[in-house]
């Protein structure tokens, strides 16, 4: 399934799992660095994305890779590709 997902077009993001309470769903926090338009200083921006986790294999604190996918529910538009690091 992950090879099929990686061949799709769409954004690929890396983030940390902050919630895994829902069945087959994880919430991933993604941090990006953006330059402030006026101050020219780099600011850390955080977004939360709801992603599909079909085997319920992720835990809180895991570093994961997610990819854009078709809408699966009202808020779920991302799919888990792989777990890069397991939390201790």
Curated annotation (Swiss-Prot):
Oligomeric and partner information = Part of the 30S ribosomal subunit.
Does the UniProt entry include the keyword Ribonucleoprotein? Answer: yes
Provide the family line. Answer: Belongs to the universal ribosomal protein uS17 family.
The cross-references to CDD domains, in alphabetical order and at most eight, read: Ribosomal_uS17
Q: Which GO molecular function, any one, fits this protein according to its record? A: structural constituent of ribosome
* Sorted UniProt keywords: Ribonucleoprotein, Ribosomal protein, RNA-binding, rRNA-binding
This chain is encoded by the gene named rpsQ
Q: Which GO terms describe its cellular component?
A: cytosolic small ribosomal subunit
What the entry lists under PANTHER family is as follows: 40S RIBOSOMAL PROTEIN S11 FAMILY MEMBER, SMALL RIBOSOMAL SUBUNIT PROTEIN US17M
Sorted alphabetically, the Gene Ontology BP terms of this entry are: translation
Q: What name has this protein been given in UniProt?
A: Small ribosomal subunit protein uS17
Where does this protein come from, organism-wise? Nitratidesulfovibrio vulgaris (strain DSM 19637 / Miyazaki F)
Q: Which Pfam families match?
A: Ribosomal_S17 (PF00366)
Q: What does this protein do?
A: One of the primary rRNA binding proteins, it binds specifically to the 5'-end of 16S ribosomal RNA.
InterPro entries linked = NA-bd_OB-fold (IPR012340), Ribosomal_uS17 (IPR000266), Ribosomal_uS17_bact/chlr (IPR019984), Ribosomal_uS17_CS (IPR019979)
